[in-house]
């Protein structure tokens, strides 16, 4: 089980310090987020290679770089080029949003064209793109992502049951089946969430929850299930909830994740 850690909670730590933190937490590598306020920003994408070197020095991999890129432009050219230079195999693209002011078909057509251009650019550099199943986008579920991909085989998918819980849920087996099997999966996002009463009477809100504290996503079923089907790709652990001590939070959730993995396989109740 290869577990990458999304570097978001560590902010703008220098590469060497980030590598130290991830190694101390017990991660296998980084899901390196390229965003303002992070170790690597869009304007300092040359630091992808520097960060990858720092991680390698600690025995860690840069298994995935996560970006906000949605179309092929000069910024995308730089970031993808630096991913290739650093030997990063996968790059997560940004989020294609639904605009209620436009009709769905128009949004989908524009997103398809933008993704196609980005995928072609990545292919020229030898980098594989992954599309996350993410709430608040045109691709919150396997079915919606499949419509966006429109048969493209060069873009993999990044299932994320925690994110999918924000808009309901989707049986993880159905997700894989709709996508076309494990061969279409580049990485699996790991986090959990809870639904709780909101401030307005009768309303409910979904908030991120420490993985170690449980939540609405049945990881004790999903993880053994993926293993049983032969999934050998990476997992990306996300700590999106407020954490005063990111290292302690990551270490705790990572320990819980590995503990689930080592438990006997649980089966879903008969239907």
Give, region by region, the residue ranges found by the protein language model.
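Acidic/histidine-rich catalytic cores of soluble enzymes
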Residues: 19, 120-216, 267-268
């Amino acid at each position: 089980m290869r577990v990458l850690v999304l570097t978001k909670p560590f902010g703008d730590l220098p590469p060497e310090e980030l590598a130290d933190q991830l190694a101390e937490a017990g991660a296998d590598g980084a899901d390196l987020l390229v965003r303002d306020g992070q170790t690597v920003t869009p304007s300092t994408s040359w630091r992808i290679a520097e960060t990858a070197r720092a991680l390698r020095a600690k025995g860690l991999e840069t298994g995935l770089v996560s970006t906000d890129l949605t179309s092929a432009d000069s910024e995308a050219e730089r970031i993808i080029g630096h991913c290739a230079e650093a030997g990063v195999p996968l790059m997560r693209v940004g989020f294609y949003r639904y605009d209620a002011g436009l009709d769905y078909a128009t949004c989908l057509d524009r997103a398809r064209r933008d993704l196609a251009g980005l995928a072609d650019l990545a292919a020229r550099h030898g980098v594989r793109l992954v599309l996350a199943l993410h709430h608040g986008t045109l691709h919150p579920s396997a079915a919606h992502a499949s419509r966006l991909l429109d048969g493209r085989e060069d873009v993999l998918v990044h299932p994320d049951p925690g994110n999918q819980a924000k808009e309901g849920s989707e049986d993880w087996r159905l997700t894989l089946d709709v996508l076309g099997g494990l061969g279409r999966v580049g990485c699996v996002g790991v986090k959990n969430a809870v639904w709780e009463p909101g401030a307005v009477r009768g309303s409910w809100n979904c908030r991120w929850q420490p993985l170690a504290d449980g939540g609405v996503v049945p990881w004790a079923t999903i993880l053994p299930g993926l293993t049983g089907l032969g999934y050998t790709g990476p997992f990306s652990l996300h700590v999106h909830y407020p954490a005063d001590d990111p290292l302690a939070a990551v270490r705790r959730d990572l320990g819980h994740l590995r503990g689930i993995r080592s438990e006997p396989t649980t089966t879903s109740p008969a239907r």
